[in-house]
Amino acid sequence: MPAVCVFFHPDRSPAVPFSPVPSPLVSAIVLNYKTPQHAVKCVQALMKQTIVDRMEILVVDNHSEDDSIGVLRNRLSTFPDVRIIETPENVGFGAGYNLGIRYARGKYLLINNPAKLPELHAAERLLSLMEKDESIGIAGPKLMHDDGTVRDSYRAFPGVTDVIIKRTFLRSWFPHRMQRYLQTGTNPDESRDVDWVIGGCLMIRRDLAEKLHGFDPQFFLFFEDIDLCRRCWAAGKRVVYYPEAVATDRKRRLSEGGVASLLLKPVGRAHIASAVKYFWKWHGAAAPR
């Protein structure tokens, strides 16, 4: 009997039984879309976490339409605590994670992109931070590239002008504004309250996620993390960057490049669409911090 449980449709019962961790404290959710090998490596990294005995792992396949499900079922069959959930269609980043949240049982949720590999103590350190301070709603780790360079893991809330300047020749004209937006003048080795952290790897309290109704599904890809952190601050909880927890990021930002390069790529056009939705949603609203 397979050890991995697959939900072929979210509203149906599991196809086969699995062996859940009793009363997990942390639910780690991995969202896969056509990168099953990365998802497997991510699960393997999660299984090495120092608090794995208090964690459950859910892998959501976002209707990849390739061999992802077969690869995941085969490669993860040795991990009886892992659940695989298959969406009936590609519902996007936020909605995909929301489905995982729906089935998660932990007090804390670790949102983990397959490209992010948490180091041995990462989950434990994020958990310890949040257990000690009830005012923290979301915590994000320091992200490192494979070459040892630090990836920007947090930024200030953007304005329309910030996004335009960053994508055009105007960037060199307004270096101080870009430094404020990109937070490049801050020390990545110091913990601090930040406007928002990268959604590819963060821990959020389950009760807060439920109060906020998870990610806003109108953002198919990009800006859902900014929106979530903004609502976290508005709900009276803090967003904290915590570099004592570290994760390796195997990919560069999907949304890098100027306006022209964004328009030429589907992922770039998705970024623009989400930006329009974000600024429309928050138009006229005061920053929550």
Model-derived segments and spans:
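Short, acidic, metal-binding catalytic loop of nucleotide-sugar glycosyltransferases
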Residues: 45-54
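Active-site-adjacent helix/loop segment of glycosyltransferases
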Residues: 9, 29, 226-289
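A conserved acidic beta->alpha catalytic loop
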Residues: 45, 61-70, 89
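Conserved donor NDP-sugar-binding/catalytic core segment of glycosyltransferases
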Residues: 120-153
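Short aromatic/hydrophobic "clamp" motif used to bind/position activated sugar donors
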Residues: 109
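A short, conserved alpha-helix in the catalytic core of glycosyltransferases
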Residues: 187, 195-213, 218-246
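Glycine-rich, basic loop-to-helix element that forms the pyrophosphate-binding segment
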Residues: 87-104
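Short, flexible, basic/aromatic active-site loop/helix in glycosyltransferases
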Residues: 158-195
